[in-house]
A protein has these predicted regions:
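Nucleic-acid nuclease catalytic cores
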Residues: 99-145
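Nuclease catalytic cores
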Residues: 23-32, 43-47, 51, 55
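Intrinsic disorder/low-complexity segments
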Residues: 1-25
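Conserved catalytic cores of phosphodiester-cleaving nucleases, focusing on short active-site segments
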Residues: 42, 65, 86-104, 115
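A short acidic/basic microdomain associated with nuclease active sites
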Residues: 59-76
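Acidic pyrophosphate-coordinating catalytic loop
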Residues: 75-81, 134-135
Length: 145
């Protein structure tokens, strides 16, 4: 299942430039974009608002992504749509989940790990725009560490 999922994303990105940035460099660029959004909007809005503004910021920085990506589950050879959706997958390397919650907690980390396992990606950024400072609302979840 996950190989087909990644192949689908690669096909989507085929019209864009080469993707040779390492995950660490991409995550820094994504975090920089989220800080810019947070600087202009501050905390207190809905997740979808922050997601839309983050998308705008990433586009302005020529960072390629897909938005609201369905993440299927394979069970006994059947691919099932269980309602999982990644907010963003950036350059087929970094999964981004936008949050506007009091605090990132274990359920958010578990969701990130589940999405990473289902997509064969290694890095998820949980971006909580409800934090007073964006750096305090940013959590890196890495699969396999």
């Amino acid at each position: 299942m996950s190989v087909g999922f990644i192949e689908f994303l690669v096909q989507d990105f085929s019209m864009f430039r080469d993707f040779e940035k390492p995950e660490n460099q991409l995550s820094q660029a994504i975090i920089g974009a989220s800080i810019e959004v947070h600087k202009h909007l501050g905390p207190g809005l809905l997740e979808k608002t922050y997601e839309a503004c983050l998308v705008h910021e990433l586009l302005g920085r020529n960072i390629c992504f897909v938005r609201q990506v369905p993440i299927p589950v394979t069970y006994k050879g059947q691919t099932l749509d269980c309602g999982f959706r990644a907010d963003l997958i950036v350059e087929n390397k970094v999964l981004v989940e936008v949050k506007a919650v009091a605090a990132i907690n274990d359920i958010h980390r578990a969701q990130a790990l589940t999405y990473l396992k289902l997509t064969d990606l290694r890095l998820c950024l949980l971006l909580n725009f409800n934090a007073v400072l964006m750096r305090d609302g940013t959590v890196r979840v890495v699969l396999g560490l």
